[in-house]
Regions:
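S-adenosylmethionine/decaboxylated-SAM
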Residues: 63-77, 83, 87-217
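Membrane-proximal basic amphipathic "stem/tether" segments
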Residues: 1-74
Length: 217
């Protein structure tokens, strides 16, 4: 009875369907490659991976709903899918560090900034964004008014203003004047090749030993 109940539950939430689809796909590959595996263990592994994926999806949706209700965000969300990997890596990387200097290039409404503020209390944050009208955002956000976006960011980050330094300028101009080094740098500004290359080059010069640079490109 226990097995039947669990089977029905897994079937209801769509886990078995996903695992079955993966099993068929990989089984075809194994036939061609002639690799032998324990099929029962493999099926259990696939079921577990599907359960984890479902839980993660539910977690992300709850997180997204929470931020949508609490802050002034639009439906445009490039950051939330990155939350699990960010949380895992950052908690491990900075577990014994009391103060983290974090630089964010490209902030938009502040989803990543707010997530860091709420979940990593020892982070001091420097954000850089000119909030100009630029094509790569407007291709996704039609008629986007960057002044309005900037106002939303200021409202969203108001309660954390003691931890956030806002630099409304280009990353190029920021790095010309900057003298501080950072433990974590997130590059999510211009997505044009030469701009990204320049941001990465500058970031390497201003990253602390054992620091982390994240690129969203």
């Amino acid at each position: 009875m226990f097995l039947i109940k669990n089977f029905i539950y897994l079937l209801r939430i769509g886990v078995i369907k996903g695992a079955y689809r993966k099993f068929n796909f990989i089984s075809e590959y194994l036939k061609v490659s002639k690799v032998k595996i324990n099929r029962l263990q493999f099926i259990i592994y696939l079921l577990k991976s599907e359960i984890i994926k479902k839980k993660q999806k539910s977690y992300l949706q709850n997180k997204k709903n929470y931020y949508q209700k609490k802050y002034n965000f639009t439906d445009i969300d490039w950051f939330s899918p990155n939350i699990p990997i960010w949380d895992t890596v950052l908690k491990q990387a900075f577990i014994n560090k009391e103060k983290i200097e974090y630089l964010e290039i490209g902030t938009y409404e502040g989803r990543s900034t707010i997530h860091i503020c709420e979940n990593f209390k020892n982070f001091k944050i420097t954000v850089v964004d000119p909030y100009n009208e630029y094509n790569e955002v407007n291709s996704v956000v039609k008629n986007s008014n960057m002044e309005n976006v900037f106002e939303r960011f200021k409202k969203n980050s108001f309660n954390f203003s003691d931890r956030i330094s806002i630099n409304r300028t280009t990353s190029k101009e920021f790095f010309k004047k900057n003298k501080k080094k950072f433990d974590l740098i997130y590059i999510d500004g211009s997505h044009h090749y030469l701009d990204v290359k320049e941001d990465l080059t500058n970031s390497i010069n201003f990253i602390n030993n054992n620091g982390i640079i994240i690129l969203d490109d």
